[in-house]
């Protein structure tokens, strides 16, 4: 259902609701309605529709990685030795189980996957790379880029 929709299906009120909630997902429907210029009931109806139709996938807290001791970020390029469907599915299933992998994207180009890995420090990253990522099904090669500073990190 969610894949059949485009932003063309949304009017300016819907887009304002999405923008407001992407900035503060905890705001009440009353606060949201005031911010987007609708009364409470129509705003609540639109919000429910946006959730039901898959435009809003969920609500979550944005955590402070530094306070949690996981502010080391590395991006790992991963090349597979086998890219047939079964091998890709096995890799996808296994990589989802690694808690340090914050994001995993299949990429077209010189490598097959790009992983965003969050750990406490470079030693912990090296352990995750050596013991977990390199052991994933069909992994033949990895290359790492260590983040010096995160300039912008947001969802959509």
Curated annotation (Swiss-Prot):
Residues 10-71 form the HTH asnC-type domain. InterPro entries: ArsR-like_HTH (IPR011991), AsnC-type_HTH_dom (IPR000485), Dimeric_a/b-barrel (IPR011008), Tscrpt_reg_AsnC-like (IPR019888), Tscrpt_reg_AsnC/Lrp_C (IPR019887), Tscrpt_reg_HTH_AsnC-type_CS (IPR019885), WH-like_DNA-bd_sf (IPR036388), WH_DNA-bd_sf (IPR036390). PANTHER family: LEUCINE-RESPONSIVE REGULATORY PROTEIN (PTHR30154:SF0). GO terms for cellular component: cytosol. It comes from Rhizobium radiobacter (Agrobacterium tumefaciens). GO terms for molecular function: sequence-specific DNA binding. Disulfide bonds: none annotated. The gene is putR. Residues 29-48 bind DNA. GO terms for biological process: alanine catabolic process; response to L-leucine. Keywords: Activator, DNA-binding, Plasmid, Transcription, Transcription regulation. This is Proline dehydrogenase transcriptional activator. Pfam families: AsnC_trans_reg, HTH_24. The lineage of its organism: Bacteria, Pseudomonadati, Pseudomonadota, Alphaproteobacteria, Hyphomicrobiales. Transcriptional activator of the putA gene in response to proline.
């Amino acid at each position: 259902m969610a894949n059949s929709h485009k932003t063309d299906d949304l009017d300016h009120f819907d887009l304002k609701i999405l923008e407001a909630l992407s900035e503060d997902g905890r705001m009440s429907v009353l606060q949201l309605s005031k911010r987007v210029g609708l009364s409470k009931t129509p705003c609540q109806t639109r919000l429910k529709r946006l959730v039901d139709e898959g435009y809003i996938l969920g609500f979550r807290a944005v955590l402070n990685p530094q306070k949690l001791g996981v502010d080391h970020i590395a991006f790992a390029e991963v090349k597979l030795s086998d890219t047939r469907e079964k091998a890709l599915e096995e890799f996808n299933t296994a990589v989802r189980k690694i808690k340090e992998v914050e994001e995993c994207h299949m990429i077209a180009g010189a490598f097959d996957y790009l992983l965003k890995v969050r750990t406490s420090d470079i030693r912990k990253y090296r352990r995750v790379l050596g013991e977990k990522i390199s052991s994933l099904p069909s992994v033949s090669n990895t290359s790492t880029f260590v983040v010096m500073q995160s300039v912008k990190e947001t969802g959509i």
